[in-house]
């Protein structure tokens, strides 16, 4: 695959004895699409779409090598020969497009999923991360030898199935091999613990087992943390030494990640954080080895990947979320059509659900499993009116037009985006503007007629769009209780973020959900230096959890950043009374009053605006109501709703 736009990224590279057509590799991303460890048609379709889209090499999600412990209920396994036929089908589907494929071999150790009947967890030592469900039992030396053989057995099965190699997961203080390598969890005093050489012994024995049994033409890749970024964890100097030992042991490629699972956001970076977050580590490790080095970590644009390779930070770029968000990422980038790539915003929705056993999903791509293979041409072309150019409305309009319908999109605002324009204002949310531009750009390509600056009434629709299928996607309105309107300066978070209102210096935000916390983050000073010029921001939340609907790394980064700026937080506190000059709240059975605030910001959620739908229903006009106009949710819900309804028109 050649590209004048990104010549380095789309040049071939040799990994071991195998030539890969380009340097965009897809790293392991759990999908939960397997069935009791077996490859499913959904899994085959998922990876086939990425192979067809131009990826050079795919590393699948973790594949467990023994039957007792499961990482996630929808992950794959290879602990006996019954799994081989499914892998044969998967490998053949990927190879059809000149793409290589490797499973990531893994034992979950203290990370095992809590499935009833699972015995006590095993680990390098009796310690595990704070979220482990119990104190693990140290694995015995005999069990280490048995597990080493099981890694080899799994690799042999994969070789029989026709895959091109395996990745061994030893990163993030994660799973058995990552746990043995890190001093955070390896407290052993036998030959497998203590010094760095002893802690990597198990990993080296696994590599030797696989190489001996699978031969020199079978790729062995090891995923490591170039630095665990954690007190008491592995350092970059440690990992330079480990990398040199891995090369000497016969490893063909080193996949340099970073961080740990216990330091949220360090391994898999959240939205708004540094792109190519582990490139500094891969750059340094690359200086000390003579085998290909891959880097990873929110590399979601082709130009970033091109610069990383050209600048010597890595030989290969692992681009997971980018390829999830748009399976055609590589083909579009190679052709110089980067503007047509569905933009990954780094929000980690793809990760948050799978950790609880849910199937993979994506905020921006509603058909992430197959990538737009789910809709078919309409049996009959219809005239379709979509009211509202937010994420739900634009998705519905595009898919309906692609299916063959004649679509008109009308919005009362002067530009597209709806609530997403406001959502893009706080820190770390700016990439939502790329989604707006992408969705809007597609409308012209699909032939959608867009009318802005026009608010339609039920009478307008009956008169001007008689006979049209009517899709209502005009969003929701902020909740603003009447008793809170008496304060001297009241505004909703939407009005503040949308530039319709300007706050004072001492601000109280009612509501500590995502919007409330992001608004506080937006208002607070960048540096908490106690300057008299700084705003003083307090968030009042009636539950015990801030930003409860955010997950994992994204929530951790948001809350940590907000608190570091000096935002005051009152959880399990309920506003009870508001006068012109005071805000009273109850906490722990006592009533407190804030008497010196000058601004009250309401971030208490949203409710669907049903007036237009009600008026049309009263007039006997059938409608499809979607997005926040139907049920308030997040951007993923809105886009998914638009996709689903449009597929049914």
Sequence positions of predicted segments:
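Conserved beta-strand termini and adjacent loop/short-helix elements that scaffold enzyme active sites
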Residues: 257, 296, 365, 453-455, ...
